[in-house]
Structure formats: structure tokens, C-alpha cells
């Protein structure tokens, strides 16, 4: 039991968790294992926004399982990957996920350090011994000799420790720790590090757009403010997404400061559509946002109204682009200009279950295949 206690204590000392600002606005903040840490509008984070409470979030790390429990204490919303954290409830934050401290602002991430070797069983560094050609005085030899004696003592201690640990090897692989070597914790951590190298980290699907923004096969164009990508699963013949380079999780986190950015996004989308319409004047386009964000990065859709695509398969796909669930980009801009914020449209999710009907003549359709055939021949 003493050995297990020492090893558990050693793991707490070697596996570290840190909170890091994505914009490097402050030094990394340590999150000790199983110790609640309060963050918010504090000098440590450099946050001065009054919408952020001084005690906005409570973070409790689990260094063994490598995740952090995030509890929202403040009145205003906080998000993990664009999904709101309910007040006084805890949500799980893992490595690679984005934590926005308040209202989609101040993005942070957590990361865990690797394990360090057990210094108690670590091999001692043997001092270089003098060669025959080296001239040493008797006083020099008297200084060197005690060091060699100390080394022997440490080796003997190591042998005693090894003899105590070896009987524990009969534990099964299902035990908390398997004592396979004189340094069980370091061996266990090395194996975990090797398995991590072999198996790539799988990010949550809601983070897919951030990876696509760096995929040269998907990127169409970019400038200092935005990136244009081809939709990986297009729902029409022409379907692009325009994303800001700033971390903005959804339209509900927009403010009047973002109006010029939204106008720029719309202008770029209209230019893309114009390039197509120069060659195919009959192609119709819409520019807009979904009422409720499903991804962790805000994006505007530029989509043609033919809806001819093999990726267009479900009623929810259809209703997300042909009902009020699809909000015109100009409406979002107008709401910010007149009211200073974007309307809360969370109740609009019910529109995704509306019966199928043609977006032109409004005639009900039986299923997706019949709807696609109807669109080809439908006239307003």
C-alpha cells in the first residue's frame, strides 16, 4: 500500500495540466490535479470585459484521465466548442477543444504534460574516473573517493527497492498499475507516449471546419480577415463556406464591432456567385447562416439553389437551407445595426422536422428522391 501511495503521489507531481490562451495574452495557468481553480475577469487572464464575472468559471483538472471539468458560475454564457455550458453545471473539456470564457470571446485550451521518470530509481550518473596519464595529487584522490562510496550506497538502495517491487509483478494487467520494471510509473508513461504517437488524436466533429481552413485541397481563397473553403459535403452544385480567421463560435456571439467583418464576408460571397453567374446567368444563390450553430467556428454559406448533390440526403439537410432556419446574411447585419445584437433563434430547431416541400412552388414532396426530381422541372 505504501508503494501505491508513493506512486500515486508521484503521478500527481509529474503529470501537469495547464490552461493556455489561444492568443497568448497571458502566461499559461497551472491547473493542479483535483483542485478547483476559479477564472474570470482577473489580472491573471488579462480580461477586462465587464460581461465576464470575476468568478466566471471553475476548472477542476483530472491529470490521470487528462480532462478538465468546467463549471459555469457567471451570469453570461461560456462555451466549449461553441456549445453553451449551463449555469452551475459541469461540462468536460479535453485537449484540442476550445473554451471561450464569455460570450464566444477569450479562447483558451488545456494541455497536459508528459510523465517524468522516477528520480528515486533513476540511474545515477557515474563520474569520469582519471586515466593513468592523468596526474592527481593525494588530496585529489581523497576528494574523489567519497563520491564513489556514495554511488555504491545508492546502488544498494536501488537493489533493495527493486527487490520490494518485483513481487508486485503478479498483478494482472487490469490493475491500476502494473509493476513491470524498477521504474513502474516511467515505464507506464513511456508506453502511453508510444501509443499516442501511433494513434492520432481524434478531434470532435464540431471542430472539423478549423482543420478544413488549413487544408489546401479545400481552401479556395483567403485574405487577412477570412478564409473561403469548399464545403466538404456540399448540398448543391455550388456550395462554399466563408469563415473569419478570428475565433467566433456563432452568430449569437457577434456584436456591433463585427459589422464590418460581416459585410466583408457577404461581399466575398457575392463575388464568388458573380463569377459563376457570368458563365451561367440562370444559377441562383443565397448567402446566410444557420439559426443554431452546429460547428465550433462561425461560417456563412454561399449555396446555389439547385440542391443537386449526393451529400444532400435527409429532410434536415433540406429544411436547414429552405426554411427560416437559414437566416439571410443581410438580416444578421441589420439586427446588429439596429439592435446591437443578433436574435436568439434556438427555438427554430423545430423547423428541421417540417414536412418536405419544394422551395419554389411549395408543393409537398413524398421523400428526398422525388423532391430532387421535382426540383429539376419545377418553375416558380
From Swiss-Prot:
It is an enzyme of class 3 (hydrolase). A motif (Histidine triad motif) lies at residues 297-301. Disulfide bonds: none annotated. The histidine triad, also called HIT motif, forms part of the binding loop for the alpha-phosphate of purine mononucleotide. The HIT domain is required for enzymatic activity. Residues 36-85 form the FHA-like domain. GO terms for molecular function: DNA 5'-adenosine monophosphate hydrolase activity; DNA-3'-diphospho-5'-guanosine diphosphatase; double-stranded RNA binding; mismatched DNA binding; single-strand break-containing DNA binding; single-stranded DNA binding; zinc ion binding. GO terms for biological process: single strand break repair. This is Aprataxin. It comes from the Eukaryota. It catalyses: a 5'-end adenosine-5'-diphospho-5'-2'-deoxyribonucleoside-DNA + H2O = a 5'-end 5'-phospho-2'-deoxyribonucleoside-DNA + AMP + 2 H(+); a 5'-end adenosine-5'-diphospho-5'-ribonucleoside-2'-deoxyribonucleotide-DNA + H2O = a 5'-end 5'-phospho-ribonucleoside-2'-deoxyribonucleotide-DNA + AMP + 2 H(+); a 3'-end 2'-deoxyribonucleotide-3'-diphospho-5'-guanosine-DNA + H2O = a 3'-end 2'-deoxyribonucleotide 3'-phosphate-DNA + GMP + 2 H(+). The keyword Hydrolase applies. The active site is at residue 299. Keywords: DNA damage, DNA repair, DNA-binding, Hydrolase, Metal-binding, Nucleus, Zinc, Zinc-finger. The record marks 212, 290, 301, 316 as: Interaction with DNA substrate. Its main location: nucleus. InterPro entries: FHA_2, Histidine_triad_CS, HIT-like, HIT-like_sf, SMAD_FHA_dom_sf, Znf-C2HE. Residues 188-197 have a biased composition (Basic and acidic residues). Residues 231-235, 294-295 are annotated as: Interaction with DNA substrate. Pfam families: DcpS_C, FHA_2, zf-C2HE. GO terms for cellular component: nucleolus; nucleoplasm; nucleus. Residues 206-312 form the HIT domain. Residues 176-207 are annotated as: Disordered. It is found in: Nucleus, Nucleoplasm; Nucleus, Nucleolus. A zinc finger (C2H2-type) spans 356-378. The keyword DNA-binding applies.
Amino acid at each position: 500500500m505504501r508503494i501505491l501511495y508513493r506512486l500515486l503521489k508521484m503521478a500527481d507531481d509529474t503529470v501537469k495540466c495547464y490552461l493556455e490562451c489561444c492568443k497568448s495574452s497571458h502566461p499559461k495557468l497551472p491547473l493542479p490535479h483535483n483542485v478547483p481553480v476559479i477564472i474570470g475577469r482577473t489580472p491573471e487572464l488579462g480580461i477586462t470585459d465587464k460581461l465576464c464575472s470575476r468568478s466566471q468559471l471553475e476548472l477542476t483538472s483530472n491529470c490521470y484521465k487528462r480532462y478538465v471539468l468546467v463549471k459555469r458560475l457567471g451570469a453570461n454564457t461560456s462555451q466549449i466548442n461553441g456549445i453553451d455550458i449551463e449555469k452551475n453545471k459541469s461540462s468536460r473539456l479535453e485537449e484540442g477543444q476550445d473554451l471561450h470564457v464569455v460570450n464566444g470571446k477569450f479562447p483558451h485550451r488545456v494541455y497536459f504534460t508528459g510523465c517524468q521518470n522516477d528520480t528515486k530509481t533513476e540511474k545515477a550518473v557515474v563520474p569520469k574516473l582519471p586515466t593513468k596519464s592523468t596526474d592527481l595529487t593525494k588530496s585529489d584522490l581523497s576528494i574523489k573517493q567519497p563520491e564513489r562510496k556514495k554511488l555504491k550506497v545508492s546502488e544498494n538502495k536501488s537493489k533493495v527497492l527493486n527487490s520490494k517491487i518485483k513481487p508486485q509483478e503478479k498483478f494482472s494487467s487490469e490493475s491500476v498499475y502494473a509493476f513491470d520494471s524498477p521504474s513502474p510509473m516511467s515505464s507506464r508513461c513511456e508506453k502511453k507516449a508510444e501509443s499516442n504517437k501511433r494513434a492520432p488524436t481524434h478531434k470532435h466533429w464540431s471542430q472539423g471546419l478549423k482543420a478544413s481552413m488549413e487544408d489546401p485541397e479545400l481552401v479556395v481563397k483567403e485574405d487577412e480577415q477570412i478564409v473561403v473553403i469548399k464545403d466538404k459535403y456540399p448540398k448543391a452544385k455550388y456550395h462554399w463556406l466563408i469563415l473569419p480567421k478570428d475565433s467566433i463560435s456563432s452568430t449569437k456571439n457577434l456584436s456591433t464591432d463585427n459589422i464590418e467583418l460581416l459585410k466583408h464576408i457577404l461581399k466575398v460571397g457575392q463575388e464568388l456567385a458573380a463569377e459563376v453567374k457570368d458563365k451561367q446567368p440562370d444559377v441562383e444563390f443565397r448567402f446566410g447562416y444557420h439559426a443554431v450553430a452546429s460547428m465550433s467556428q462561425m461560417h456563412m454559406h454561399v449555396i446555389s439553389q439547385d440542391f443537386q448533390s449526393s451529400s444532400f440526403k435527409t429532410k434536415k439537410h433540406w429544411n436547414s437551407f429552405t426554411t427560416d432556419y437559414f437566416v439571410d446574411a443581410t438580416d444578421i447585419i441589420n439586427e446588429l445595426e439596429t439592435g446591437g445584437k443578433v436574435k436568439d433563434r434556438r427555438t427554430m430547431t423545430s423547423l428541421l422536422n417540417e414536412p418536405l416541400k419544394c422551395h419554389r412552388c411549395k408543393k409537398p414532396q413524398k421523400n428526398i428522391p422525388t423532391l430532387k426530381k421535382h426540383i429539376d422541372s419545377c418553375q416558380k
